[in-house]
Amino acid sequence: MKVMKFGGTSVGRPERMQQVAKLITTGQESKIVVLSALSGTTNALVSIGEALAKGDKPLAKQIIDELEAHYRVFIKDLLKSEATLTKGEAVISEHFDFLNIILKISFNEALNKDILAQGELMSTKLFSAYLEERGIDHALLPALDFMQIDANDEPYFDAIRVKLNRILQQHTDKKLFVTQGYICRNSKGEVDNLKRGGSD
């Protein structure tokens, strides 16, 4: 099993995401492909959290709207078939509906971690839609189902190994897997992250 990690710049434009698809489909070995959020997304999500922490909901809303507009343009360049474009639009609507809902919720650090997770969740779902459009067989593995940190915020490798192996055994017919970098669950089972660069 080979692990291939692609950062935000590698998937930051539709043509780069398409190049990643070509790279990961060469050779016969099984691969787990780990993707970051599209470049600029995590910075925008951090800014949303900072604005909400200061009580500046109009600024948070402005950043959300600008980011959503960017994603709407992105998928139109990435996805060409009506079916996968519809799927891509549904992904964007799901995650930006969440970001708009949080404007009405009391802000706290746990909510901030949920905000920060949205970038990787979107990038991998959109990439999966592109692979599907190209007829590339794969499985999308949610990192939140197996990536875990301990009480010291360090990767809990034993738990990760057991959970990931269990998931892979459910997909013995697949040789290509896509998952998220950066995001994980903490020792309380809450959405958390490995900090910037931590997924490397």
Q: What kind of region is each of these model predictions?
A:
Residues 1-200:
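Nucleotide/pyrophosphate-binding catalytic subdomain
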